[in-house]
């Protein structure tokens, strides 16, 4: 049988063996002692035709719990959002289908312009001056922000709010360990950073203060109150933010943030089992030469035509490895393109409307749950996620919800022992009133 990906015929094999000077394929392994050779049949299924294989893999895929078959109220950093149809069409074009920013930019003007537009839109959302072409994800972007802060201030202490996503905090701690930085976690009160505890830890040795906006619990951190505390010790103010929320919230840049990072997954990137995603990284203009990753700039050629180039490349490892501001080379250019196309398709008004729908639907879900006797421990304003307290273990409740065709919320107790039996519920613009009402009813039944 001639296989599509193994096109060699028996005649081809005989000809190759003849040229090599052996009689059979077994002769190629003559140097391997008989005592260590495997004898018998390998535990491998027989070959199948493409239609047979397609049916088998489709049957396996049908066993997956995805958002096409289940209604999802799970968020915690990865969200079920609307993706405009045009996104997949554009990113599937052969000119774009790569994770790399090009090394020969003059022959990739279309790709560079798309990345330039991504950078521009991130700056508009965050209120910052400069954004790079992308990072791996939100967690690594935040860790790189910490490293930039430490290098810029020449200080070793990092104040990290416990309301920052637990996985982001783990990545930050991993990076900090290698650089011998001291990470101090700031506790929370009523679901937001404890300002008094933050003041107590502030001193002249602090490189940066890190908060999330909205934070892991969905709460809106009081950036206006945090900023003067963060800058009191000549430290840097770093904010990790959901870019969709910035479509309606005041951008961190207007509160005096020095670095704003986050994950662009809400724009055009599927949930896809948690990755790959696309981190973004934006800074004030004073930090432009210390920002990690690639930067696309706009210029003019000698004939006055607009063009795009990779600029300030001396920061990068392929130019000066020992003095590079980061070692990111390949990045998430394809996902950055997806985010750029999604934001363009939605437009400023569409992004704002989408963000408003998240707030409205999440607020409706919270109010309905409160009506049905659920306790919401954090009273402050939130974006599209909120925490509720259950009477039973979250894992047990989620198992029962799954049987009803619902993917329940995140078990907060996994990361916060003091919040056992608390569920983080995400409600995006895709959830209908009927789906929310059904979820409230089923959660109430599980709760009883």
UniProtKB/Swiss-Prot annotation:
Gene3D superfamilies: Aspartate Aminotransferase, domain 1, Type I PLP-dependent aspartate aminotransferase-like (Major domain). It catalyses: N(6)-[(R)-lipoyl]-L-lysyl-[glycine-cleavage complex H protein] + glycine + H(+) = N(6)-[(R)-S(8)-aminomethyldihydrolipoyl]-L-lysyl-[glycine-cleavage complex H protein] + CO2. GO terms for molecular function: glycine dehydrogenase (decarboxylating) activity. Its EC number is 1.4.4.2. It comes from the Bacteria. GO terms for biological process: glycine decarboxylation via glycine cleavage system; nucleoside metabolic process. Signal peptide: none annotated. Keywords: Oxidoreductase. Belongs to the GcvP family. N-terminal subunit subfamily. PANTHER family: GLYCINE CLEAVAGE SYSTEM P-PROTEIN (PTHR42806), GLYCINE DEHYDROGENASE (DECARBOXYLATING) (PTHR42806:SF1). The glycine cleavage system catalyzes the degradation of glycine. The P protein binds the alpha-amino group of glycine through its pyridoxal phosphate cofactor; CO(2) is released and the remaining methylamine moiety is then transferred to the lipoamide cofactor of the H protein. The glycine cleavage system is composed of four proteins: P, T, L and H. In this organism, the P 'protein' is a heterodimer of two subunits. This is Probable glycine dehydrogenase (decarboxylating) subunit 1. It comes from Geobacillus sp. (strain WCH70).
């Amino acid at each position: 049988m001639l296989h599509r990906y193994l096109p060699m015929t028996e005649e081809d094999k005989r000809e190759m063996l003849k040229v090599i000077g052996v009689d059979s394929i077994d002769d190629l392994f003559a140097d391997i002692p008989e005592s260590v050779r495997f004898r018998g049949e390998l535990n491998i299924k027989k070959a199948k035709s493409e239609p047979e294989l397609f049916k088998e893999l489709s049957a396996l895929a049908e066993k997956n719990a995805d958002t096409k078959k289940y209604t999802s109220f799970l968020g915690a950093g990865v969200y079920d959002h609307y993706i405009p149809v045009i996104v997949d069409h554009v990113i599937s074009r052969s000119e774009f289908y790569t994770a790399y920013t090009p090394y020969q930019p003059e022959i990739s003007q279309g790709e560079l312009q798309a990345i330039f537009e991504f950078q521009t839109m991130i700056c508009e959302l965050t209120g910052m001056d400069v954004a790079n072409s992308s990072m791996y994800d939100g967690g690594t972007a935040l860790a790189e922000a910490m490293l930039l802060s430490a290098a810029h201030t020449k200080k070793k202490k990092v104040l990290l709010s416990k309301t920052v996503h637990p996985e982001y905090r783990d990545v930050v701690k991993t990076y900090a360990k290698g650089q011998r930085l001291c990470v101090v976690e700031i506790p929370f009160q009523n679901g937001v950073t404890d300002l008094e505890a933050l003041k107590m830890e502030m001193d002249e040795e602090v490189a940066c203060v890190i908060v999330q906006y909205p934070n892991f619990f969905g709460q809106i951190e009081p950036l206006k109150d945090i900023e003067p505390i963060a800058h009191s010790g000549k430290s840097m103010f770093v904010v990790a933010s959901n870019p969709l929320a910035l479509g309606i919230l005041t951008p961190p840049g207007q509160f005096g943030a020095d670095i704003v990072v986050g994950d662009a997954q809400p724009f055009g990137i599927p949930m896809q089992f948690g990755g790959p995603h696309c981190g973004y990284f934006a800074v004030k203009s004073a930090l432009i030469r210390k920002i990690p990753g690639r930067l696309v700039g706009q210029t003019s050629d000698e004939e006055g035509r607009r063009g795009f180039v990779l600029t300030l490349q001396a920061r990068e490892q392929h130019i000066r490895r020992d003095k590079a501001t980061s070692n990111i080379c390949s990045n998430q250019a394809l996902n950055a393109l997806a985010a750029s196309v999604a934001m363009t398709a939605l437009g400023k008004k569409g992004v704002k409307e989408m963000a408003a729908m998240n707030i409205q639907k999440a607020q409706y879900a919270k109010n309905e749950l409160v009506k049905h006797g659920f306790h919401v421990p954090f009273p402050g304003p939130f974006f599209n996620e909120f925490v509720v307290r259950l009477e039973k273990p979250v894992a047990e409740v989620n198992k029962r919800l799954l049987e009803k065709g619902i993917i329940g919320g995140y078990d907060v107790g996994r990361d916060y022992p003091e919040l056992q039996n608390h569920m983080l519920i995400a409600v995006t613009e895709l959830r209908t009133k009927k789906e929310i009402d059904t979820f409230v009813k089923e959660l109430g039944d599980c709760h009883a």
